Amino acid sequence: MRVLVTGAYGLIGSACLARLHRDRHALVGAGRSISEARRRLPYARWVAADFARLTSAQAWLPLLADIDAVVNCVGVLQDGARDDTWRVHVEATTALFEACARAGIRRVVHVSAIGADHAGPTSFARS
């Protein structure tokens, strides 16, 4: 199976990628900065993706070409100059799910944090 793993060089994403590699899946890893990822995890094909900008299904569709399954491990811990928790955790994820439906991808795994709550005390918890 050809699997897209988002957030693929983070802690959880890289563990998912390694397991899928052991299971002999064809892998596409997506992340913001892929030069180090290519060096550390050479068994995946890498594509650069700024998840805060992938907030429409149309934006995701090119990344989903020829993909059979998606494992979404994207996550940011707090808002900052490069990170927007709401855009990444809510808008981009919603757009990814819509794009998967449009592309006919029925196998989607989404990794989230326990305790997510729209009334939470931090932007991370609220997203």
Label the model's feature ranges.
Residues 1-25:
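N-terminal Rossmann NAD(P)H-binding glycine-rich loop of SDR-like oxidoreductase domains
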Residues 6, 30, 73-74, 108-114:
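SDR active-site strand-loop-helix element
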Residues 6, 93, 127:
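Ser/Thr-centric signal marking residues that sit
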Residues 29-38, 51-54:
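N-terminal Rossmann-fold cofactor-binding loop
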Residues 37-45:
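Short, conserved SAM-binding/catalytic segment
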Residues 44-95, 99-102, 113-120:
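NAD(P)H-binding glycine-rich loop region in Rossmannoid oxidoreductase-like domains
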Residues 103-107:
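A short helix->loop->beta-strand "cap" motif at the edges of active sites that frequently abuts
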Residues 119-127:
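Active-site Tyr-X1-5-Lys
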